């Protein structure tokens, strides 16, 4: 996986990340992917359609960002900090059908956007570990 602890700042938040909600009939995973596509200027790609056509989230991110999408399953919240610190939010699955977008961190808190309620939330490292443990620590990220 992509992680270098020595090269990770202690505090970081991805720029230009406003709250967002799921659209009509849109999954939280598709909403998170579409928010990343908007951030990367690839709004012409619809994540819901791509997922329905059998593409994985990592494949969608690879095609849309000009970088490389990664399935970071098994990483810890601490390990995804490296990816976030490179101005790329990370999708975290809280369950098989509930995705959130992790956009920042400090030593004491993680910041994430939940498209299910349209709100910004924070969680301590222990809370974040608990939130993602139910999905088996499923994270999806990308590098540019």
Regions found by a protein language model. Name each.
Residues 1-25, 29-144:
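Conserved active-site-adjacent core of cysteine acyl-enzyme catalytic domains
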